[in-house]
Regions:
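Bacterial N-terminal signal peptides that target proteins for export
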Residues: 18-32
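Bacterial N-terminal signal peptides
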Residues: 30-41
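N-terminal active-site segment of His-dependent metallophosphoesterases
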Residues: 44-111
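His/acidic metal-ligating clusters that form di-metal
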Residues: 55, 86-93, 192, 197-199, ...
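Structural recognition of the beta-strand scaffold that forms the well-ordered cores
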Residues: 61-65, 92-97, 102, 125-130, ...
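Active-site environment of divalent metal-dependent phosphoester hydrolases
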Residues: 71-73, 102-104, 130-139, 207-211, ...
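Extended active-site neighborhood of metal-dependent phosphoesterases/phosphodiesterases
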Residues: 106, 110-221, 297-328
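A short C-terminal boundary segment appended to hydrolase-like catalytic domains
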Residues: 323-349
């Protein structure tokens, strides 16, 4: 890691605007630019279909965001500032890895709908994954004690209405709900772009809702979705796999720890699939609210870091910034990561 540079890649004419959501849009916004601090992505050992875009771009950029907006200031100023800068950038799409409100505020329909409308102001396709503050934490007294399962269904009804992304341009998404045994799980998605498999999962922090009646079926669905993503990536000789979810799976905790137990089986599957795939694998998540890139997954036998696996955690409350990811087929690491600090959101230290 530790490469400084500029990136400038082409536009994406094959992703066309579609109608239907434009009435929700507030505005299109323009121009912003920042110096890029870039990090190489993952190490490399060697050099039912998912939805895919129309042409296999060899180089492109996309954005990763998460854990925003959390409060009124973020919702009315800081989050729109970030959307403004992303709208001015050349991006294939934007992925939000979960949590669009604080865990201490009520899980109302109005809170959901407000952010849904804001997502439609994205000029780029926007893909949203579910986080704990929007459903699994909604049973807390301080959130007005909503039923988590009912709130999860509300999220599905609002944010997964079609088999396309949100935003003013669209990306087609394959949903796990197309498989009869996983018909409930519309939020689990995948798509391919430029030789990379992207798979989004419903994995909420802090503990993946472990020990609840809904955990078992959802965990089984997530594991099957991960396995399918790797199987397709292998069959189609794709260059890399990126898994995206909200929860920090607590790589640093003992497997017996209360917070880790809900992730153990999933991490075992990710380890097995990563070792078999042998190409770059990236796990993106939010939850802990600070930007980092590291390689925390250890081999079960070697107890050494698995070289082709990288964890990326996105910015989050109170830091309302975004991460640019550059993809290049010709780079053996495939991904490079560039934190983008929103000029209007910078603090005076």
């Amino acid at each position: 890691m530790g490469l400084f540079g500029w990136t400038r890649f082409g536009d994406f004419p094959h992703i066309r605007p579609t109608s239907g959501m434009n009435s929700l849009s507030q505005r299109l916004i323009s121009m912003a630019a920042l110096v890029i601090l870039s990090f190489t992505g993952c190490g490399t050992l060697a050099g039912k279909q998912p939805a895919r875009t129309a042409s296999p771009d060899l180089r492109y950029d996309f954005a990763l965001i998460g854990d925003v907006p959390y409060d009124e200031l973020q919702a009315t100023h800081l989050f729109p500032n970030m959307i403004e800068e992303m709208n001015a950038a050349r991006l294939a799409f934007v992925v939000h890895d979960g949590d669009i409100k604080s865990g201490s505020t009520p899980c109302t329909d109005e809170a959901f709908e407000r952010v849904f409308v804001q997502f439609q102001t994205s000029r780029h396709p926007l893909i949203y994954l579910f986080g704990d503050n929007k459903w699994s934490d909604c049973g807390r007294v301080k959130t007005n004690a909503f039923d988590p399962s009912e709130r999860l269904q509300k999220l599905r009804d609002l944010f997964t209405q079609s088999d396309q992304s949100l935003g003013q341009r669209k990306v087609a998404l394959a949903r796990q709900s197309s498989e009869p045994r996983f018909a409930a799980f519309r939020e689990n998605i995948r798509w391919t772009h430029g030789g990379v498999m992207f798979a989004g999962l419903n994995v909420p922090g802090d503990d993946n809702h472990f020990g609840t009646p809904e955990f078992g079926p959802r965990n089984a669905a997530n594991i099957a979705w991960i396995q399918d993503a790797f199987a397709i990536a292998t069959k189609e000789n794709l260059r890399a796999v990126m898994l995206i979810m909200q929860a920090n799976p607590h790589f640093d905790l003992a497997v017996t720890n209360r917070l880790r137990r809900g992730f153990n089986e999933m991490l075992e599957v990710i380890e097995k699939e990563t070792l078999a795939f042998k190409k770059p694998v990236v796990l993106v998540h939010g939850d802990s609210h600070y930007f980092r890139i590291d390689q925390p997954l250890l081999g079960s036998r070697s107890r050494r870091r698995i070289e082709n696996f990288t964890r990326v955690e996105t910015f989050g409350n109170p830091d309302v910034h975004w991460l640019r990811v550059s993809v290049d087929w010709r780079d053996p690491n495939v991904f490079r990561f560039h934190p983008q600090y929103v000029r209007k959101n910078l603090l005076k230290h």
